[in-house]
Amino acid sequence: MPLLQELNTRYLGLHVPKEDSFWSSKMGLKSAAPGEFENHELALKAFISDQTWLPKLREALKRQDLTDAERIGLCGWLRFFEVNVVESDDAKRLQRELVEMEGELDRVRRKMKLGYTDPKSGEFMEASSGKLSLMTATHAEEAYRKAAWEGMRSIERYVLDHGYLPIVKKRNELGRLMGFEDYYDYKVNLFEGFSKRKLFEILDELERDTRASVQSAVDQVQREKGLSSGRASVVDAREPWNFGFLTSGDLTARRDPYFQFSSALGRWGASFNALGIRYHGATLKLDLVNRPGKYENGFMHGPQPSWIDGGKHHPARIGFTANAVLGSIGSGISALQTLFHEGGHAAHFSNIFMPSPCFGQEFAPTSVAFAETQSMFLDSLIGDSDWCARYARDEKGEPMPLEIMEEGVELGHRLAAFRIRSLLVVPYAEKAIYELKDSDLNAESILARVREAEKKLVPLTSSARPVLSVPHLLSGESSAYYHGYVLAQMAVHQTRAYFLEKFGSILDNPQVGDELAEKYWKPGNSKTFLELVQDLTGKPFSAAATVALVNRTL
């Protein structure tokens, strides 16, 4: 089928160099030329937004001599262009301007002199966001935890002063020009196929049903370890630099010997292999250690999608990153979580077997929520006591003590509501930002909306992770996106409940890997998030499993 072949070839000719330059840019490689990624991005956007493909595809689909594979491939491209086409010249202009503005903000942000002021010497100490996060969670002295948190929060004012405001305004202009309420509404429809209103009906229900649990959890920590405990030398558990340390800082330190960075890669490979997860000849490129100039959040990208061409499989080529801060407490478990998370993304995109690369790329119409379900389901395994009993070993090969595992399970349960509501902070804040009128769009109004969202979702004095320090908000690809993690967490609980009810155990069960590959991964984006979750679990997507878990008494 000439049209199908042309689309497959032209798309790969644009997608592959764009993703390769994306990697060079985000990794801070010397080979990355300023503006190179933006140029490739603009070329790809011009292709995917070209409305002239739609009548050609509709006409081709009328043919009676198409093979099943050809019809499926053409239908995939039709949906791809229906989602991505931009007919308005003004909208195309806005897209081009946004790519350039976002690229400049990214370059400026990565050059930011980030760090903390040493509370004893008064000296400014440079530190990455990864190191600051670890310090906030694990440093034994409150003054240093606070200094690290303040270092993270400094990102907020910095991005507001260096280009984020005009980007928000222009994004909203694009969203309205595309026929939506605002940019957030546009992005939700683009990736998930339903409206912002529908999304927040789901999230509002989750917020309501977890409200009492999170307040109870924070109050309990304050009673046991904070100001209400009656102990000497206590700190306020409700301060954002104290809550994480009081709930898990000591546990993180005691678990640390069993999660060495040097063992992370082997444990990821052994665990995924035992689950029956295969990468089908994919080439994986890993960049795992933190360094200056490197993008400060783990991610996966796929320069070469996995797809089938006339019966021949083209394996995926995938890169993913972690930001391990070697020698720091918690760096080993952080690296392992990233390997399971980003390696989960890689497993998903390596197992797509459809007759066009449009089914196996990670952008619209691929669902953000569904993609994150795969990675978050797999990184959830590390928190299971049976996984720890089998894989968590110290340097002498000794297993993690049972009491540490039990404490980890208890902590995970106690903080379940807090953790999912911490995720909720970002979409609620970002929604509020994009709902500001242009005349009200300034740094103070944005910060006020962010603080309102923090106060609504998490009963601390502020969010443990300052909202505008979350890099997703700055990038065009991941802005108005974070709700996908919340929907994914709900789908993870539903998926886990299904497997546990069916098999009794997930650990090292190859039947789990087989079902993931067949029901979740193979179809690519030929089905929606809601359809895929129901196909596997046999039940419509809902918050039921999440709410039941969060509110269950130990």
Name each model feature, range by range.
Residues M1-Y158, A480:
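N-terminal helix-rich structural modules
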Residues S31, I72, R79, F243-F245, ...:
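C-terminal, non-catalytic "cap/extension" segments appended to globular domains
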Residues E123-K131, L165-N323, E398-G412, F418:
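Active-site-proximal, well-structured secondary-structure segments within enzyme catalytic domains
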Residues V159-G163:
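Amphipathic, heptad-repeat-like alpha-helical segments
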Residues D185, N189, S331-I333, Q337-L339, ...:
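Post-HEXXH active-site segment of zinc metalloproteases
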Residues F194-R197, R255, F259, A324-S334, ...:
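Alpha-helix capping and helix-loop boundary segments enriched in small/acidic/polar residues
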Residues L203-A212, A364-E403:
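Post-HExxH zinc-binding segment in Zn-dependent metallohydrolases
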Residues L288-G293, Q304, G310-A316, Q337-T338, ...:
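Alpha-helical recognition segments enriched in aromatics with Gly/Pro capping
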